[in-house]
Amino acid sequence: MDRAVSTTTNAVEWAKAPGLTDYPSALAEMQARAAAIRAGEEAERVWLVEHPPLYTAGTSARDADLLHPGDAQVFRSGRGGQWTYHGPGQRVAYVMLDLSRPHGRVPARDVRGFVAGLEAWLIDTLAGFGVRGELREGRVGIWVANPLGGESKIAAIGVRVSRWVSYHGIALNVAPDLGRFGGIVPCGISEHGVTSLAALGVAATLDAVDAALARSFERVFDAAPQPV
């Protein structure tokens, strides 16, 4: 069925996939939507998904950092970055935007600015749950300080931009099985841990996180999420 493209420049489709989405289907859907956005045939979209247990390798991933995947599937993703884990209890948001034009805080044709926008989006979302997300020099993603010292990663960012249309996106740990991250060296960083909202004592549902993501997206990208 044909979907009309919104003529409102500050509106972005906001879609949520039911159940668990297999990775090859997600990748094919992202690539198709990115091509349609580039051709002016479809609207920009943020797509919220939850995956079955799997590991994805970015373009900088080293084979040695895949330690013991167990029964989880393994994929080469084509996005930037290194290894990460996706699975139940983690909210993945795939972000397909036309970066040839500005989006709120993100200038036109500025990939670094786009990544900074994704960082700000996650930090603002976490603040709504009383969690202080922080950036670290030389380390992509969002970090939180541990009560007993040190720090852990709570959200990952990995994107690809092709002819100024983005795809892939962010992964926020709500209540996943953190033990699964032991199957890899997450993002090539072995000296720091991984955490989640649940591990921090925040009892948030995926629906509550989705609502917070929508509010924060509008603030950062100046684009009203339009449910589809």
Swiss-Prot record:
Keywords: Acyltransferase, Cytoplasm, Transferase
Biological or metabolic pathway of the protein: Protein modification; protein lipoylation via endogenous pathway; protein N(6)-(lipoyl)lysine from octanoyl-[acyl-carrier-protein]: step 1/2
GO biological process: protein modification process
Domain of life of the organism encoding this protein: Bacteria
Catalytic residues in the record: 187 (acyl-thioester intermediate)
Keyword Cytoplasm set for record: yes
EC number of this enzyme: 2.3.1.181
Disulfide bonds: none
Cellular compartment(s): Cytoplasm
Residues reported to bind substrate: 79-86, 156-158, 169-171
GO molecular function terms noted in the UniProt entry: lipoyl(octanoyl) transferase activity
Residue ranges constituting the BPL/LPL catalytic domain according to the UniProt record: 40-225
GO cellular component labels: cytoplasm
Broad class of enzyme this protein falls into: transferase
Site (Lowers pKa of active site Cys): 153
Keyword Glycosyltransferase: no
Reactions that this protein is recorded to catalyse: octanoyl-[ACP] + L-lysyl-[protein] = N(6)-octanoyl-L-lysyl-[protein] + holo-[ACP] + H(+)
Function in brief: Catalyzes the transfer of endogenously produced octanoic acid from octanoyl-acyl-carrier-protein onto the lipoyl domains of lipoate-dependent enzymes. Lipoyl-ACP can also act as a substrate although octanoyl-ACP is likely to be the physiological substrate.
Family, as annotated: Belongs to the LipB family.
Misc. comment: In the reaction, the free carboxyl group of octanoic acid is attached via an amide linkage to the epsilon-amino group of a specific lysine residue of lipoyl domains of lipoate-dependent enzymes.
Protein's name in the database: Octanoyltransferase
Record gene name: lipB
